[in-house]
């Protein structure tokens, strides 16, 4: 089976790079997006196993991205972890109401982040998503030949 795929959505190139390096050490393929609309396109194109999603983004905020993703039945159990500098109770509740699975605050501990991501990626639902993605990618390759 192929490596799990995590979509990291953050407008900070530094945060994207730190998360990417952290997860690549765990043999996780990382796809990045710097704004909301690019993130939605990446969800459709890459079929990630998990999304790490900032809240404050250009073109569409993380709450709205989460709501759009959750409207698609294919992504109803896709883990979405909001990763934000906003640490108030209201922000966390708003994230849950938008459909996030979990909420972590920045600055984050790299080890804790990797453990949290791996916990979701090791679930039976994640393995099922990975198998569906692999079948989808094989179908795309056959159509290109």
What does each model-identified segment do?
Residues 46-52, 57:
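Active-site beta3 strand of CheY-like receiver
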Residues 108-117, 129:
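C-terminal output helix
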Residues 122-145:
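CheY-like receiver
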Residues 17-25:
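Charged docking surfaces used in two-component/phosphorelay signaling
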Residues 27-34, 42-43:
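Short hydrophobic/Thr-rich beta-strand motif most characteristic of the beta2 strand and flanking loop
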């Amino acid at each position: 089976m192929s490596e799990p795929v995590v979509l990291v959505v953050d407008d900070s190139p530094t945060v994207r790079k730190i998360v990417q390096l952290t997860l690549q050490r765990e043999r996780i393929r990382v796809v990045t997006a710097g704004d909301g609309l690019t993130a939605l396109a990446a969800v459709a194109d890459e079929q990630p196993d998990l999304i790490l999603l900032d809240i404050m983004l250009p073109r569409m905020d993380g709450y709205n991205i989460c709501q759009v993703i959750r409207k698609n039945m294919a992504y109803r159990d896709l883990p979405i972890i909001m990763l934000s500098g906003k640490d108030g109770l209201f922000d966390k509740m708003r994230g849950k109401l938008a459909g996030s699975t979990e909420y972590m605050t920045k600055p984050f501990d790299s080890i804790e982040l990797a453990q949290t991501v791996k916990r979701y990626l090791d679930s039976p639902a994640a393995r099922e998503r990975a198998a569906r993605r692999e079948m989808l990618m094989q179908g795309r390759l056959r159509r290109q030949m």
